[in-house]
């Protein structure tokens, strides 16, 4: 185990167009091979699609989607007396955001639309309406935690 302690958290600069740190974090999640320009273009095009179709502010739709995706509970494996238990634990706020962004991008990539901006826009709009694969993932995570509620006393 490392003796130095945890690495310091880096401060994320807010996005130049929407002035939001959450948007910057989404761009960072979308980015592949360090191509930030391409990731930014994908996100801004997706936001244009959202604005065109909903007629409302895309950042508002995105924040609504994130609130519907971010999990409150998750399960963590804990070994007690030779058997593993799935122990439900509360998710820390920073991890909630990280998981929400990860699920949003992963399930957007798996969608069937032609271009990535279309996929991302559809997934964000679906999540804002409480449908879509990323919201289903959150519901499944909560169901797992609820099903294993009996092992909550093993929390550490």
UniProtKB/Swiss-Prot annotation:
It comes from the Bacteria. The keyword Acetylation does not apply. GO terms for biological process: translation. Belongs to the universal ribosomal protein uS7 family. The lineage of its organism: Bacteria, Bacillati, Bacillota, Bacilli, Lactobacillales. This is Small ribosomal subunit protein uS7. InterPro entries: Ribosomal_uS7, Ribosomal_uS7_bac/org-type, Ribosomal_uS7_CS, Ribosomal_uS7_dom, Ribosomal_uS7_dom_sf. HAMAP family: Ribosomal_uS7_B. One of the primary rRNA binding proteins, it binds directly to 16S rRNA where it nucleates assembly of the head domain of the 30S subunit. Is located at the subunit interface close to the decoding center, probably blocks exit of the E-site tRNA. GO terms for cellular component: small ribosomal subunit. GO terms for molecular function: rRNA binding; structural constituent of ribosome; tRNA binding. Keywords: Ribonucleoprotein, Ribosomal protein, RNA-binding, rRNA-binding, tRNA-binding.
């Amino acid at each position: 185990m490392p003796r130095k302690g945890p690495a310091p958290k880096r401060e994320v600069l807010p996005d130049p167009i929407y002035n939001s740190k959450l948007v910057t974090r989404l761009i960072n999640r979308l980015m592949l091979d360090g191509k930030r320009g391409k990731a930014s273009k994908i996100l801004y095009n997706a936001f244009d699609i959202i604005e065109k179709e909903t007629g409302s502010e895309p950042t508002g739709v995105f924040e609504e989607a994130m609130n519907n995706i971010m999990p409150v509970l998750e399960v963590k494996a804990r070994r007690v007396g030779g058997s593993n238990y799935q122990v439900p634990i509360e998710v820390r706020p920073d991890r909630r955001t990280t998981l929400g962004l990860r699920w949003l991008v992963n399930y957007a990539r798996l969608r069937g639309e032609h271009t990535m901006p279309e996929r991302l826009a559809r997934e964000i709009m679906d999540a804002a309406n409480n449908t879509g694969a990323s919201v289903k993932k959150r519901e499944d995570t909560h169901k797992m935690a609820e099903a294993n509620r009996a092992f909550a006393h093993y929390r550490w």
